[in-house]
Regions:
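A ubiquitous, low-specificity "background" feature that marks scattered single residues
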Residues: 3, 19-21, 127
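Bacterial N-terminal signal peptides
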Residues: 10-19
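C-terminal region of N-terminal signal peptides and the immediate post-cleavage residues
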Residues: 18-34
């Protein structure tokens, strides 16, 4: 079995080698797109009014899923598609390769378009160089011109699937956060930015064998916190900030409440969506005392403040959680279906549910090939939450950016 694993990638490539028979045309570099800013219509309020009464959980923000992602090269996508038919177990482990055919703009470009929430996949790489030679590329002799040059640096890395889907707008967590912090410094009145971190520890599915992936144990979780503090500094919204003098976060959000939008402008909040790492992250830090990230906990837990509901379902559960004071993250689209009507319905439900953080692979400026896109009606960065506010408690001028 061990020998089979060692040669599985080579066998996979040999079985579908026809995919690389024809060289694709040269690709443009999506990392060099100039930043353009969305323009607010004439006559729309330019000064926040009432944001000192509006709470952070009374906003709704749209953002990108896998915010750093650049689609794999055509020959890699073709190889994966053919491999999925030859090795069904590979397809089961990695999913449909067609769902990788999307490229996001750079993070500053997305911010300029109005996105205020992002999702980053993070791998541990304390010594550097762990991801500089993707197995699939090496096996077929593909020299990827978009392989980031800074992958060899020590530190946390940002990419989708090691050895399979490695292209990224920013290869290190410090690079990604540096871009966001730089934009934030230039726009200090922006709405709070919410960043969802998925800490990845899984390698390739059986029978493939690839780059060994390091786990996020207690010391490595401390490294994550240290990198976040180094990059963002005094711009953080931390669990300590929200808890205040309350005994735990759950009590805080149901009594004192979340910070106001006014107090949150120009700041950045991090949420770790790995429920399996929650206990390790809490160890020695009850109710996240001294920690940087909010956790994916369960309803009613002491550290519960932000919850993950990837599928909006019919929207009713999310609406119930929002009414209790939680901030909820959901997805508008979990891969496009053949029917745009079906995926459009899911997006509409996600927005109507009141989930404060709605992630999509197709945000403003990046529609799918069938025209599907998730955006607010006006070119604004956020809106009053449809569940936790009413016209009497929130009007759009409270959530604009000066």
């Amino acid at each position: 079995m061990r020998t089979w694993k060692r040669y599985a990638v080579a066998a996979l490539v040999g079985a579908v080698a026809v995919a690389g028979a024809c060289a694709p045309p040269p690709e443009s570099d999506p990392r060099t797109v100039p930043v353009t800013t969305t323009t607010i219509p004439d006559g729309y309020p330019s000064t926040p009014v009432g944001d000192d009464q509006l709470r952070l959980n009374q906003l709704q923000l749209i953002g990108s899923h896998n915010s750093y992602h650049i689609a794999p090269a055509p020959q890699i996508l073709d190889l994966l598609a053919n491999a999925a038919s030859v090795f069904p177990q590979v397809a089961a482990g990695l999913g449909d390769p067609a769902t990788l055919r999307y490229t996001h703009a750079t993070l500053p470009q997305q911010l300029a378009r109005g996105l205020r929430t992002f999702e980053l996949d993070v791998y541990a790489d304390p010594d550097g160089g762990r991801f500089t030679q993707p197995v699939l590329a090496s096996t077929i002799g593909f020299q990827d011109p978009l392989l980031p040059s800074n992958l060899g640096q020590p530190g946390l890395k940002v990419l989708h699937i090691a050895d399979i889907d490695w292209r990224t707008q920013c290869a290190t967590l410090q690079e990604c956060l540096g871009q966001i912090r730089g934009w934030s410094d230039a726009h200090p009145g922006h709405l709070p930015i919410v960043i969802n971190l998925e800490l990845k520890a899984d390698g390739l599915p059986d029978p493939l064998i690839g780059t060994p992936i390091l786990p996020f144990d207690g010391p490595m979780l401390d490294v994550v916190d240290a990198e976040l503090r180094a990059a963002v500094g005094d711009r953080l919204i931390t669990p300590d900030d929200v808890r205040g003098s309350a005994p735990d976060l759950r009590t805080a959000i149901t009594t004192t409440g979340w910070p106001t939008v006014a107090a949150s402008r120009g700041k950045i909040l991090f949420f770790m969506d790995n429920s399996g790492l929650r206990n390790a992250y809490l160890q020695g830090h009850p109710s996240l005392a001294g920690r940087v990230m909010f956790t994916s906990s369960g309803e009613g837990q002491p550290d519960g403040a932000i919850l993950k509901e990837n599928s909006p379902g019919d929207g009713s559960r999310i609406a119930q959680l929002v009414a209790q004071g939680y901030i909820v993250r959901t997805r508008a689209d979990q891969d496009l279906t053949p029917s745009i009507d079906g995926v459009r319905t899911q997006a509409d439900i996600a927005l109507a549910s009141g989930a404060q953080i709605v992630h999509t692979d197709f945000p403003a400026g990046e529609p799918a090939g069938n025209g599907y896109v998730v955006a607010f009606g006006l070119p604004v960065q956020g809106r009053c939450n449809p569940v936790s506010t009413t016209p009497a408690t929130c009007q759009q001028p409270a959530v604009v950016e000066p």
